[in-house]
Curated annotation (Swiss-Prot):
A Pfam family assignment: RecX_HTH1
Organism: Vibrio cholerae serotype O1 (strain ATCC 39541 / Classical Ogawa 395 / O395)
Compartments, record wording: Cytoplasm
Function as written in the Swiss-Prot or TrEMBL entry: Modulates RecA activity.
Full protein name: Regulatory protein RecX
Gene responsible for this protein: recX
Domain of life, source organism: Bacteria
Amino acid sequence: MSFDLATCRQSALQLLSRRDHSEYELHQKLALKGHPTEVIDEVVKYVLELGYLSDARYAASQARQIVHKGYGEQRLRQQLKEKRVAEEVIEQALAEQTIDWFELAKEVAHKKFKSGISHERSQYAKQVRYLQYRGFNFEQIRYALQASESDE
């Protein structure tokens, strides 16, 4: 297959017109379409120069989505690392979030466990695992479960 620079640019612009992507993610998607690595590198550089591609903007967008879906800080970090976003960019995206992760964990626990926090060991462990899976750390989980218990 013979792909030229214009075709690769067009593919990149179509992808970026739908939503933000990380540099790595855009590179992978263009490679899946069969574009040569040299051409992809040139196109990524081109869209970066135009400001169409930004890991910082992508990280901020992902952070808003994660918070809106009720996931925690750990989950956000994990997802951004999977997309090969730089650690500094992740830290910046987290710093821009004005969310109280403790209160978010409490809201998620309250929404999921309407019947209240269980004092039975196996059920309590299940609730802790659920909040861990959602990306909350142990301090946030402890706060959420204790706060939910005192709300009852």
